[in-house]
Amino acid sequence: MDISSWFESIHVFLILLNGVFFRLAPLFFFLPFLNNGIISPSIRIPVIFLVASGLITSGKVDIGSSVFEHVYFLMFKEIIVGLLLSFCLSLPFWIFHAVGSIIDNQRGATLSSSIDPANGVDTSELAKFFNLFSAVVFLYSGGMVFILESIQLSYNICPLFSQCSFRVSNILTFLTLLASQAVILASPVMIVLLLSEVLLGVLSRFAPQMNAFSVSLTIKSLLAIFIIFICSSTIYFSKVQFFLGEHKFFTNLFVR
């Protein structure tokens, strides 16, 4: 092997490495157990390159002149595919984060909001708890294997350095699913809190000297924790596991 072919092999390897990197990088920015709050950037970037180097299949990728001519466009396409994949894999965590925010809003505890390092946003205590709960269940149920399967599926649907067509309209369906599932999962607690508000209102009407609403936060918090304890081992646990077996959220975003 002469020096020119050796440099060409290195050039091809670096292009493949960057292509895989741009698809994997959004995963490490969006997933709550891989982002800035958990893994520092100085460690995360080398880890992404290490994982990307293990996913390179140079023998199965056709590196032609068109790749070098449109390399920036193809890299941008890889970023879009990585973002769509990250959105789909982050769906259960976003849903449970929204569930915690809805419950805290209904029980009047949003004053305790603080900066969540795992998400980088102003979040409530229950939102952080549900986010960690979903991450634990996700990893306990084989979530890392599911992530690798999803990455493999993304390359089957949209191979490296090939053109893909996206269904932009299905992104609205994705957002609808996010909002609807959050409301559905929070509905048992919301119903109980609504009934407690009604009972406290009746009590305050007939016994105003008791000042029932001064203890409403405590009562609603106890009721919310009780309902969450009942639902956590059945509804919430099974819902996270349900998303582990669903690849359709990602596949529906592409025209095949």
From Swiss-Prot:
The keyword Cytoplasm does not apply. Keywords: Cell membrane, Membrane, Plasmid, Transmembrane, Transmembrane helix, Virulence. GO terms for cellular component: plasma membrane. GO terms for biological process: protein targeting. Its main location: membrane. The chain crosses the membrane at residues 13-33, 37-57, 79-99, 129-149, 183-203, 217-237. It is a multi-pass membrane protein. This is Surface presentation of antigens protein SpaR. It comes from Shigella sonnei. InterPro entries: T3SS_IM_R (IPR002010), T3SS_SpaR/YscT (IPR006304). Required for surface presentation of invasion plasmid antigens. Could play a role in preserving the translocation competence of the ipa antigens. Required for invasion and for secretion of the three ipa proteins.
